[in-house]
């Protein structure tokens, strides 16, 4: 989740960059959720790809905010008591202008969604369902229970309704709308990287400021 703050700074610093932040379900929906929500709310022109394996795999299998209720791991040996967050619904409801979900075993569709997300002008979010073969092997679950939605929703309400489906797992692009970006409204055509001052100019301004105090 912390990568999202850095990604926003990179994009604002140099709007000519195409910026993609790769995060996990644990950090994006846990300790970094505030960064994710505000990047979506602002409509910063970046792409966030959230790899969702439903577990903290690097620390041997603890549950995350998106793990299903009843998930058993080192931190929840009796099963998690919490209902999981729905990343797609969260992103829709905080204002993300492009929201999609893909599955790592469906490479062709995954690639197509990645491309469309990166071409979208504004904040784009892609949740990638991917099993953790060591601590949360969900291949069978996803192979049997995922389906692709026919087309993106015509409205926010329709997108939210699709994202709320529980008996199956919808894949595809839920939402894709045009809206002014935070970067454009903030920068108004400027590029802070190419228009930055030289080191001597910066030092001169600092010295001038200090002298005036």
Set out the residue ranges of the language-model regions.
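Active-site rim beta-loop-alpha module in soluble metabolic enzymes
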Residues: 94-103, 121, 125-133, 139
């Amino acid at each position: 989740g912390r990568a999202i703050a850095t990604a926003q700074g990179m994009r604002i610093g140099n709007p000519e960059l195409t910026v993609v932040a790769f995060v996990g379900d644990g950090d994006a929906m846990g300790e970094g959720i505030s960064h994710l929500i505000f990047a979506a709310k602002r409509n910063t022109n970046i792409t966030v790809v959230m790899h969702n394996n439903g577990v903290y795999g690097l620390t041997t299998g603890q549950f995350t905010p998106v793990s299903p209720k009843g998930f058993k791991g080192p931190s929840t040996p009796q099963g998690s008591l919490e209902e999981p967050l729905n990343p797609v619904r969260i992103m829709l409801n905080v204002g993300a202008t492009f929201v999609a979900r893909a599955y790592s075993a469906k490479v062709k569709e995954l690639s197509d969604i990645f491309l469309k997300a990166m071409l979208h002008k504004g904040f784009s979010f892609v949740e990638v369902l991917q099993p953790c073969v060591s601590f949360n092997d969900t291949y069978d679950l996803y192979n049997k229970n995922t389906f692709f939605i026919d087309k993106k929703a015509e409205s926010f309400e329709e997108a939210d309704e699709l994202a709320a489906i529980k008996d199956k797992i919808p894949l595809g692009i839920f939402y894709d709308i045009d809206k002014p970006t935070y970067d454009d409204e903030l920068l108004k055509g400027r590029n802070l990287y190419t228009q930055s001052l030289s080191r001597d100019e910066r030092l001169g301004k600092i010295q001038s400021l200090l002298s005036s105090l």
